[in-house]
Amino acid sequence: MPVQPEHEPAEGTLAGWAGRHPGASRTLEDLGRGWALFTRQGWNRQRVVATVAAVLINSLALIVTINVVPGLSASAEWDVVLAVVLAAILTAGLRPALQALALAFGWVGVLVVGLFARAAILYLAFVVTPDIHVDGFWPAFAASWIAAIITIAISWLVSAGDETEFLSQLLMFSHHGRIPHQDEPGVVIVQIDGLAAPLLQWAVVSGNLPTLSRWIRAGSHRLTPWHAQVPPTTPASQAGLLHGNNRGVPAFRWFEKDAGRLVVSSKPKDAALIESRMSDGRGLLADNGVSISNLFSGDAPVSHLTLSGFALGGRPARSFAAFFISPYGFTRSFILTIGEAVKEVYQARRQRLRGIEPRIRRSGVFAAQRAISNVLLRDLNTVLVAQYIMRGAKSIFCDYTDYDEIAHHAGPTRAESLRALEGVDRVIGTLAALAAHAPRPYEFVILSDHGQSQGATFRQRYGTPLEEVVRGLMAGAGSPATDSIAATGTEEARTPVSRFLAEVRQQHGMVGMLSRSKLAAVVEEEPGAARPEAAQGGAARPEAPELVVAASGNLALVYFPRHPGRLTAEEIETAYPGLLAELASHPGIGFVCTRTSSDGPVVLGCDGVHRLGSGQITGVDPLAAFGPQAAADLLSHDSCDHVGDLVINSRLDSGTDEVAAFEELVGCHGGLGGWQGRAVLVHPATWPVDGELIGAECVHRQLVRWLERVGHRSDLAPPTARVTSSV
C-alpha cells in the first residue's frame, strides 16, 4: 500500500477530494461552521423572547395548516411545536450545505433551493417527529407555503409592518464572522429615485416619513434641494453623481448618427458603453465602495445589480444565497410580491372607477414589474446593503426605484406612490438601526436623482404620438419619412428587472452560460439598439432611417439620420420647408431648440425666439414659464454629445404645472416643466454645503468633499483617460 506524503490527505478521503477541488474546501468549512454558528450566537433576553415568539407563531401557523392540507395529521399540538423546533435546527445546520448546493448551479440553483428548501426541511421534520403523519413530499410542500403565508400575516399584525426582525434573521443566515472595529466612519448613500424636493418637504411636515422627518426635525440632518439639469433622468444624473461627468448623456435614449444606432440606457450593453465613456477610475465609490442596484458602478470594486457591470464577467451568487435559502427571505418576499401584484390590479381599477385624471392604462405587465421591483428586488437590495454595512464597507450607494416606478404609472402625488415612499423610509430606518451595531460608525446621505412631473400624455391630448406629428409635417413639406424609428417606449419601467436579469447572466458555470444565451433577448435586443460592431464612423449610411424620434418623458430628440452631423436650422428648413415653424406653433409643444449657423443654439416658440448664446429675445420668451434655470440648462444640453438635430419640449400647463409626456406615462421626467428638475439631498447637518448645487456633477463634487472630510479617498490612483465619443 503506497504511503501518503506527510500532511497530505489520503486520496480516498473527503479531505483529499477537497484538496483536489479548491472550491470545495470552503464548502466543507461552511458545513463544519453551520452548527457552530447556531450554538455560538450570544443569547440575551431580547433574543430569547424573539425566539420563543417565532416558535409560537410558526407553531400556530402550522397547526392551522395541518388541519387544512390533505395528507397531514398530528396527534397533539406539542408534536407540531416539536416539528417547528426541529425544522429550525435543521435549517441552521443545513444552511451551509444548501448554500453550497445553490451556488454550484448558479442562479437557477439559488431559485430552486429557495422554492423547495423550506418544504424539504419541513418534510424531514415531519418524518422524524413522533405522531405526525405525512403522505409524501407534496403535502409538506403545500404546507410549507400555506404556513408561510399565515406566519407572515401574523408577524405583520404583531410587528405592525416593522422589518427589523426580517433583516436580523437574514443577517444571521449570512454571518461572516467577527469584523474588527474601525473608527473611520463609513457612508451609506441611499437614492430615492424620482423624489422631488417639494414632495419630500411636504412628507416631512406631514410626518408620513417618520425616519427622515425625525432626522430633520431633530437637527441631525438637513434637507437641501438641488437642481437636476436637463435632462433630469436617472442615467444623466447617476453618471454625474457617480462619475462626475454626464456630458455624453443627452437623454434616457438617443441616436448616434456616426454609428447608426439607438442607445437606450436601460440596456446593459449600452449602460456599459456609457460608463466606459464617463469613468476616469476615480468615481464616487472608487475607494473600496459598493454599488448596489445602480445603472453605473461609480468605479466601485464591488457591485451587485449594477447594470453597467454585466460585461465584467461572472460573479458567484454567494451574497444572494442567504436571502434565497432563508425562510425569512425569498419565501416571505415571494408571497409579498404576489400580494403587491394583486394590490396593483386593485389600485388601478379603483383609479379607473373613481374617474381620476390624468391617468393611463396600467397593464398586467406593469403589475408584474411593480411586484418584482417593489418587493422582491427592494428586499434583496436591503439585504445586500445590510450585509455590507455589517462587513464594514467604506461607502455604499444603493438606488431604490419603488416610488419612481409607481409614480410613472399612477402619478407622483397619488396615494399608492406615497405609500411606496413610506416603504423606502421604513427601509432607511431599519438600515440606520442596524448600522448602530456595525463594525464602524456610519453616516447616512439620502438623495434623489430628479423629481417627476404629472400630466396627460401628448397622445391622450392630441390623439396622435409626436413621431406621427413630425412625420406628417415632413410629408406636408414634400419629404415624407417612409422609414423612421419611434423610440418612445417605457423601457425605464423595466430597468430594475433588467438589473436583476443582468446579474443572473453574470454567473459562472453551466447555468450561467445557458442563462446568458437565453436572457440576451430579454435584456438587450430591440430594433436599433446599440451594437458596437455597427460603429462605422463618417457619413451616415444611405440605408439609415429618414427620421428618429427618441422620447424621454416630455423631452424628445429628433434626428434626421440620412444627413450626417448635426443639422442647422437653415439646413432643416431647406430639407423640410416650414417644419420648424409648424412644430413651434403646435399647441402641445412648448418650444423647439435647434442650432443656427449664425446665432448658435436658439429656442423657438409659437410667438418668439430666445437666442441662448447672447440671451437676446425676440417677441415672447418661449422659456418664460420654465423657470430661471431653463436657458442655462438648454445651453449646457446643446453641447452634449449626440444631442438631436431638434430638441422638443412639451407644453407646460400654467394652472397645474402639468406637462405632456411623449411616452405613455402619467408621471414623467427628462425635460423642463413642473417638479422634474427639483431633486433633493438630505445630509448630516454638520457637513457644510459649498454653495448652490446646480447639476449632478456639482453634487458629485460635494459628495467627494464629504467623503474626503471623513478620511476616504486619500490613496486613490490618478485619473485615467476617458473614452472619447464623437459628437
Across the structure, where does each feature detected by a protein language model lie?
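Juxtamembrane/disordered regions of integral membrane proteins
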Residues: 2-138, 153-162
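His/Asp/Glu-rich, glycine-adjacent segments
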Residues: 161, 165, 244-411, 553-560, ...
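Active-site-proximal N-terminal segment of extracellular/periplasmic enzymes that hydrolyze or transfer
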Residues: 167-220, 461
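Active-site nucleophile/metal-coordination loop of metallo-enzymes that catalyze phosphate/sulfate
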Residues: 197-329, 333, 478-515, 519-525, ...
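Acidic, His- and aromatic-enriched active-site or binding-groove loops in soluble protein domains
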Residues: 243-256, 317-320, 385, 418-426, ...
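Active-site neighborhoods of enzymes that stabilize oxyanions during catalysis
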Residues: 266, 270-279, 285-288, 292-299, ...
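A long, amphipathic alpha-helix that forms part
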Residues: 375-376, 380, 388, 396, ...
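Metal-dependent active-site segment of extracytoplasmic phospho-/sulfohydrolases and closely related
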Residues: 425-463, 601-604, 609
